[in-house]
């Protein structure tokens, strides 16, 4: 189902949600951190979804184990580097890795600024070694509140040349986007692109807020957009992208099943929607699974899957010359 003549992208992929089980085991041993299991096989059910039944609480608990072992800046550099290696192994030509430096720093009270620097270094090394084009998106974890997000933003801005865009993630219901207008004004002043998690837990009004108040060019998940016909029209007309994550949305109970996922509706409506993974190490999937298993199960035709692949490049936070160069590189094999 993947068109090998086109670049394969993943533009919604959490770096801190893609920490290998083996790495969690290694770092746990290195720093004498108590883990729920002591071998890879017994650890895996604690850090990766192994049940078909959606369970948000369990999903989040598995996600947290990855950052609980980040006890040094070198550990942060390592997982960033391995994220690029994983992208190369998955056959990705271009990947946007998003991360919350505060989330990565909090368990062991690492310097947030140092985490940003370590992640940038790891990704740059990975791009050099594995010939993958990767960009970084900084996340503000709104669950920590406005003041903490300003500190997180300051750490990202201190290394602005290594960051491509800003995202807002976390408790969408308790911390609406309007609280973070000033933060995103600063991001736009820095020349960054804007993408926002919205319409995942909250309704269409959260997506409108992300667009009108934060300047979102893309929306993460955005499944609730289908509840508002005017919003669907607006997304299509203004070419605001939807970063769809099929398997993730089922595992977190955002949608009831793949068959009920709105990605097909987005594509039929002319919305620029793309296929992405989200937290692949936790989900136990890769981008190939999303194209060959999840997308057909969501009702997408072969042509719609190809369109989603095209949309991934269209929506990428790259200049037109960079996109053209990527297309040419893939064509040459």
UniProtKB/Swiss-Prot annotation:
Pfam families, A to Z: A_deaminase
UniProt keyword terms in alphabetical order: Hydrolase, Metal-binding, Nucleotide metabolism, Zinc
Enzyme class: hydrolase
Catalytic activity: adenosine + H2O + H(+) = inosine + NH4(+); 2'-deoxyadenosine + H2O + H(+) = 2'-deoxyinosine + NH4(+)
Residues forming the catalytic site: 200
Residues the entry annotates as binding substrate: 14, 16, 170, 279
Cofactor requirement: Zn(2+)
Superkingdom: Bacteria
GO cellular component terms given for this protein: cytosol
Molecular function, one GO term: 2'-deoxyadenosine deaminase activity
Binding positions for Zn(2+) per the UniProt entry: 12, 14, 197, 278
Textual note on the cofactor: Binds 1 zinc ion per subunit.
EC number: 3.5.4.4
GO biological process annotation, one example: nucleotide metabolic process
Site (Important for catalytic activity): 221
Family per record: Belongs to the metallo-dependent hydrolases superfamily. Adenosine and AMP deaminases family. Adenosine deaminase subfamily.
Function as written in the Swiss-Prot or TrEMBL entry: Catalyzes the hydrolytic deamination of adenosine and 2-deoxyadenosine.
Protein name as catalogued: Adenosine deaminase
Organism from which the protein derives: Klebsiella pneumoniae subsp. pneumoniae (strain ATCC 700721 / MGH 78578)
Lineage: Bacteria, Pseudomonadati, Pseudomonadota, Gammaproteobacteria, Enterobacterales
